[in-house]
């Protein structure tokens, strides 16, 4: 499941950590990198 809602991020990959209840997987890698910096 690409869209994770709630605290189920524990079972997801580090790249799929929940952000505000919405998985950051929905964002492009560029946006993802932007969040890290």
From Swiss-Prot:
Q: How is it modified after translation?
A: Glycosylated.
One GO biological-process annotation of the entry reads: carbohydrate metabolic process
Record keywords: Developmental protein, Glycoprotein, Secreted
User: Cross-referenced InterPro entries, in alphabetical order?
Assistant: Glyco_hydro18_cat
Enumerate the residue ranges of region (Disordered).
Answer: 1-20
Indicate the family of this protein. Answer: Belongs to the glycosyl hydrolase 18 family. IDGF subfamily.
State the name under which the record lists this protein.
Chitinase-like protein
As recorded in UniProt, coiled-coil segments are none
């Amino acid at each position: 499941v690409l869209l994770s809602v709630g605290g189920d991020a524990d079972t997801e990959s580090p790249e799929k950590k929940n952000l505000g209840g919405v998985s950051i997987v929905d964002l492009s890698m560029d946006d993802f990198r932007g969040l890290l910096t």
